[in-house]
Regions:
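Acidic, glycine-rich active-site loops and adjacent beta-strand->loop/helix elements
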Residues: 85-87, 145-153, 176-180, 204-206, ...
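Polar, glycine-rich mid-to-C-terminal structural blocks
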Residues: 205-208, 212, 217-269
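N-terminal helical capping/dimerization or prosegment-like subdomains
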Residues: 1-93, 317, 334
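An extended, acidic, His-containing surface patch that forms the Zn2+-binding/catalytic region
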Residues: 88, 182-183, 240-317, 328-338, ...
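Active-site metal-coordination/substrate-binding segment of hydrolases
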Residues: 76-143, 437
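Acidic/histidine-rich catalytic neighborhood of metal-dependent amide-processing enzymes
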Residues: 116-191
Length: 452
């Protein structure tokens, strides 16, 4: 029945999704501030069309929130569905094979910024709700909360949740913003890493200076920054900030056995991103490195002359954006201060260092014995034909731990992305097969949840 419904309504569904994608709701870029409001308003319209009884765009300290609800019985359980309508910047545009904000279907995939993260996945939730609502299959209440700042760390959502605790009161939270290991390896995410993110600025002379007149006589800020970053890890991939690992727990033998049982194709993994060799902390497998271990990365670095031809200068300033993915028990605020203090302490006196903490969030672990998890597990199994693996994956959704702290409920991470979907990258996409299966699996979740 659900397959037939999707087939008969897919053209309309895609038109609705594409109306969201065409709004360039890039939260990181101030120029797109009006687009955030436009996208929120469009989501409100789509939720009403899907069957909620109430939907509104609500103000926050930042970009607007979208709230919707379908209350079938005040004494029944309530599922809160969370998603985000903001997307990552699409740059570099020249690497896209089609316009990032003009969705295109080719080779069985939807190609666009937000096709997966998270417009596509949130839309899966909305269409699954549409089916159960319009067919009078719901026995529990459903609420939606969609934010517009997830890609910049959800700075406004915590205060919004605190202010609207009663409105958002629920028994469990359902999120589609994660990935499966493969379409033939159904997966439910049971853990997320936390994150801490900084921008570092290294200043030398008070202006860009002639590299012949000053080269060898003063410190070059770019050289210094590169050395500071290089010295933060060793050749075995271990992070060298003192105290960084103090609260990191080793994975249990059972957890390591579970990860080892996941059939990850390492050659295919390398081929998909065109690298010849993998690298990471010595003594751990690839899935252990991304699931159970913290990491340190440079997300951007710039300074000096980068135009055509040559310009012989020593730059006044050099910059980098840095991030650490964290594991449960590592506090992002503590790590934020620890890393900031480290760089200021070890920097040579020949330069000035300013480091700003931009955003962060805690990690999260979902207990796999909770009834709602079992409903999700069954919902996925009914569609994909096999029981989904329980796996901790390397990404971060900082607000998940905040939901638990304020609302006191757990979150089920029921994602339908794939690594090949290239989220945060040029040519982001979503297979139509996963779009369809996702809707069907979430419908099954709701039906199974009602049996609890």
């Amino acid at each position: 029945m659900i397959k037939k419904y999707i087939q008969e309504n897919e053209e309309r569904m895609l038109d609705e999704l594409f109306s969201l994608i065409r709004i360039p709701s890039v939260s990181a870029q101030q120029a797109h501030k009006p687009d955030m409001q436009r996208c929120a308003e469009r989501w409100k319209e789509l939720l009403l069309m899907a069957g909620v009884d109430r939907a509104e765009v609500m103000p926050s300290d930042g970009n607007p929130m979208v709230y919707g609800e379908k209350m079938v019985d005040p004494t029944a359980k309530t599922v809160l569905i969370y998603g985000h309508y903001d997307v990552m910047p699409a740059e570099p545009f020249e690497l896209w094979n089609s316009e990032p904000f003009e969705a295109e279907v080719r080779d069985g995939r939807i190609w666009a910024r937000g096709a997966d993260d998270d417009k596509g996945q949130s839309f899966i939730q909305a269409k699954a709700f549409e089916y159960v609502a319009k067919n009078n299959l719901l026995k529990h209440n459903i609420k939606f909360i969609l934010e517009g700042e997830e890609e910049v760390g959800s700075p406004s959502l915590g205060a919004f949740i605190e202010k609207h605790k009663e409105l958002l009161k629920c028994d469990v939270i359902l999120v589609s913003d994660t990935s499966m290991i493969g379409e033939d390896i159904p997966t439910l995410t049971t853990g997320l890493r936390g994150i801490a993110y900084w921008q570092i600025e290294v200043t030398g002379p008070n202006r860009d200076v002639h590299s012949g007149h000053y080269g060898g006589a003063i410190a070059n800020p770019i050289n210094v920054l590169c050395k500071l970053i290089a010295d933060a890890t060793n050749e075995d991939g271990r992070i060298l900030f003192p105290g960084f690992y103090d609260k990191v727990e080793e994975a249990s033998d059972d957890e390591r056995k579970m990860l080892a049982s996941i059939p990850l194709d390492l050659e295919g993994y390398k081929k998909s991103i065109e690298v010849d060799e993998l690298f990471g902390e010595k003594g751990y497998s690839t899935l252990e490195r991304t699931g159970f271990r913290p990491s340190f990365d440079v997300c951007g670095i710039w300074g000096g002359y980068t135009g055509d031809g040559a310009k012989t200068v020593i730059a006044s300033k050099a910059y980098a954006k840095l991030s650490c993915r964290l594991v449960p028990h590592q506090d992002y605020k503590e790590i934020g201060q620890l890393v900031s203090d480290y760089f200021k302490r070890v920097a040579p006196k020949s330069v000035k260092v300013d480091i700003k903490f931009l955003h962060g969030g805690q990690g999260y672990v979902c207990p796999i014995d909770m009834p709602a998890y079992k409903a999700a597990e069954r919902g996925v199994e009914m569609v994909f034909g096999k029981r989904p693996l329980a796996a901790r994956l390397g990404g971060s959704i900082p607000i998940i731990s905040t939901f638990e702290q304020i609302l006191g409920v757990k979150t089920i991470l029921m994602g339908f992305g794939l690594e090949s979907n290239a989220i945060h990258s040029p040519n982001e996409n979503m297979p139509l097969s996963m779009f369809r299966k996702g809707i069907e699996a979430v419908v099954n979740f709701h039906l199974e949840y009602d049996k609890l």
